[in-house]
């Protein structure tokens, strides 16, 4: 039997640190791109695996 470990949600600040950008950049990406962000109440939350896949896809570039 395989065990699946649930991935934790991270905050917008943690997402910015993970990607090496400012929080304002993350906010701009939320408005202008399809960054995998999930609004939970008033807060934006992210999954590291989704962010990494998004960056690898090349969609993080803003024209």
Q: What are the residue ranges of the model-derived segments?
A:
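Residue-level detection of the helix-turn-helix DNA-binding "recognition helix"
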Residues: 31-32, 56
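Polyanion-binding surface elements
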Residues: 2-28
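Helix-turn-helix/winged-helix DNA-binding modules
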Residues: 7-8, 32, 43
